[in-house]
């Protein structure tokens, strides 16, 4: 297995390396079967939207969560309570509750889909680091971020695999898109976290009116939380790309490209000409169910539907 390691640019003589800043990644790529992908406990999956944009999905098993984190436990409790309250509100037969749900849903659909991508990337402190055993390299040891930081220079980190469809995407394109995602995410979500927190005090007078729920306050609190989560996801993604201690390996996922081809084979020549000059929408209503089934990521259905809706509207505006 070929590892992606940090090497100072001056020491690189091989041509089969891809540079990202001061890091170098091997471009001697390995192919991965669908079964290997499905059994990978933690991975990054690149889901092309157009030939220029992709949805970056960080997926991991639940046993990789840092169960010792009090913050994570508290957050989980709050999220469960909030979700229960939201479900109750959605089921309410009262007309004003239905209007509130419709308004909030409309606002949520207007947030950039890149936010949903970053929300799949947990805070780095929430995930246990996987390292190789000192004597037995086939053994996997899991450490909290705090313990890993102390030992990082003396241990070998288990690789994080990045799966993509060959022919549609490539390692350099994946890196470009991930870099753009975290750079824009850090700026955008830091700014909107601040805006939401500044707006919260303005909703306090509504608390004094018992018959009217403080919907703006609840919404701004939720949006502040989401923006913080997305910001931390962007920070984690930056660490994965820039830290020499991280170990990224790119994998061509066998059969992945063919899934896209099956979904786009019905496109007519006229439609192709009509969209000339604009990025082709590779992720659409036909390819979506095929991708969800192939990758077994049905939990992303609402997120990817949001992507299709926003990108379709964007293309329609560009045609005018």
Curated annotation (Swiss-Prot):
GO terms for cellular component: mitochondrial inner membrane
Superkingdom of source: Eukaryota
Pfam families linked: Mit_KHE1
GO biological process, one term: proton transmembrane transport
InterPro entries recorded: Mit_KHE1
Protein family per UniProt: To S.pombe SpAC23H3.12c.
Annotated PANTHER family: K+-H+ EXCHANGE-LIKE PROTEIN, TRANSMEMBRANE PROTEIN
Name the UniProt record assigns to this protein: Uncharacterized protein YDL183C
